């Protein structure tokens, strides 16, 4: 099977990868000191981190810290907000969400001069302008895009075939399909990350965007507690009978394990988890999981209930090391050859890396299709993270029936507005 994936109008995401077929070449730069990276730990980013370490030399140590879940962004906030000396990390991996937050707070530095200097040497034109635009602000480039990531629909092809089921295209169809699987003896057919906090707020965002919802008005005042917000939350609530009793504590890692251990039949899952479905060292379902577009919120919309998410590498405003050396190391880890090697793990930013063959790349087709169908980017307002936090913390009680959805969303909106004013985002 061959996938030739156009980046089309990917006005939202990417991946600058990291393996290397040749030794790391730092040219005539003085390779000494210690370079450190703070990054998330999921497979594709660990892959890049490992390739960075190939640049170590007798006088150059590369010490990377990989942490799970949203902890990387929490640690980055602490590091970047500190006014005491230089950052302990030379490179920090950011998400689409945290990038805009750090940019507005002027905590990261532009790297336009280095991008231009090494443009030809590393064939950076291979990354489309729409991808570079993600990292551009006021004419300056502030990040090296790493990858495009989206949640897509994972499903057990063998179980769907066995029970003559069609892949659901709306969340109502997900519920109907789940009920059919339950009748067939599968108690908890659905698994997706709906744990309190970041994960649940992300699922809410996916459905809210599919409904055409806008988070804020032009002045930054909240809109997510309106009719579409209530509908999005009710759709989430309708999924709980299909999920295990610990549904509201499920993380992305736990969802991945559920699929690997034959405890899930379907769910909206991050595309970067797809390669682990076929990892025969840990998975019991090798070759059995297939991929489709994320379902839409309802039959009246064609927008997939997902968010185009991107990750990138940024340099702290107060950088301790030689910034050109740090940049060169990142370029070596993101070479054309390295990105091609990493295509199995994620959707890469270089156009040349997206012509791939093999069943291990079968998850990529759904990503391209969702982009064509109008999938929305993750909200980019610098203050969006405040709303995300409030929703993730307030909504679980409503989904458990301890309060109404309307009350929970109103409280989240009030909490967001108060904090956004306190931090000076809005008047």
Model-based region annotation:
Residues 202-203, 234-321:
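Extracytoplasmic/periplasmic substrate-binding proteins
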């Amino acid at each position: 099977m061959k996938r030739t994936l156009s980046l089309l109008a990917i006005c939202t995401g990417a991946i600058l990868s990291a393996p290397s077929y040749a030794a790391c070449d730092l040219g005539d730069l003085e390779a000494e000191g210690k370079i450190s990276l703070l990054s998330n730990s999921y497979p594709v980013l660990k892959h890049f981190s490992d390739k960075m370490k190939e640049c170590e030399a007798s006088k150059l140590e590369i010490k990377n810290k990989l942490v799970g879940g949203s902890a990387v962004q929490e640690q980055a906030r602490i590091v970047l907000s500190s006014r005491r000396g230089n950052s302990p990390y030379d490179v920090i991996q950011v998400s689409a969400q945290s990038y805009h937050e750090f940019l507005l707070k002027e905590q990261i530095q532009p790297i336009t001069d280095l991008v231009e200097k090494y443009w030809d040497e590393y064939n950076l034109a291979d990354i489309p302008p729409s991808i570079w635009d993600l990292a551009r602000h006021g004419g300056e480039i502030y990040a090296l895009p790493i990858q495009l990531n989206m949640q897509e629909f994972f499903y057990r092809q063998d179980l769907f075939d066995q029970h003559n089921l069609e892949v659901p295209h709306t969340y109502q169809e997900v519920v109907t399909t789940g009920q059919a699987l339950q009748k067939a003896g599968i108690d908890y057919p659905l698994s997706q990350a709906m744990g309190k906090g970041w994960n649940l707020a992300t699922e809410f965002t996916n459905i809210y965007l599919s409904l055409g919802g806008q988070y804020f008005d032009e002045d930054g005042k909240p809109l997510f507690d309106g009719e579409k917000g209530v509908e999005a939350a009710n759709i989430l609530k309708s999924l709980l009978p299909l999920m295990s009793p610990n549904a509201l504590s499920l993380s992305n890692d736990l969802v991945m394990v559920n699929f690997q251990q034959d405890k899930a039949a379907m769910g909206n899952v991050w595309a970067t988890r797809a390669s682990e479905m076929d990892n025969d060292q840990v998975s019991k379902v090798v070759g059995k999981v297939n991929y489709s577009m994320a379902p839409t919120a309802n039959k009246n919309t064609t927008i997939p209930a997902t968010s185009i998410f991107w990750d990138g590498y940024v340099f702290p405003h107060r950088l301790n090391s030689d910034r050109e050396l740090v940049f060169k190391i990142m370029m070596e880890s993101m070479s054309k050859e390295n990105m091609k090697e990493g295509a199995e793990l994620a959707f890469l930013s270089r156009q040349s890396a997206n012509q791939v063959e093999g069943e291990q790349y079968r998850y990529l087709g759904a990503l391209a299709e969702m982009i064509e169908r109008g999938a929305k980017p993750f909200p980019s307002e610098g203050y969006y993270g405040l709303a995300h936090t409030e929703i993730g913390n307030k909504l679980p009680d409503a989904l458990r029936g301890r309060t109404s959805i309307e009350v929970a969303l109103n409280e989240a909106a009030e909490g967001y507005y108060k904090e956004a004013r306190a931090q000076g985002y809005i008047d």
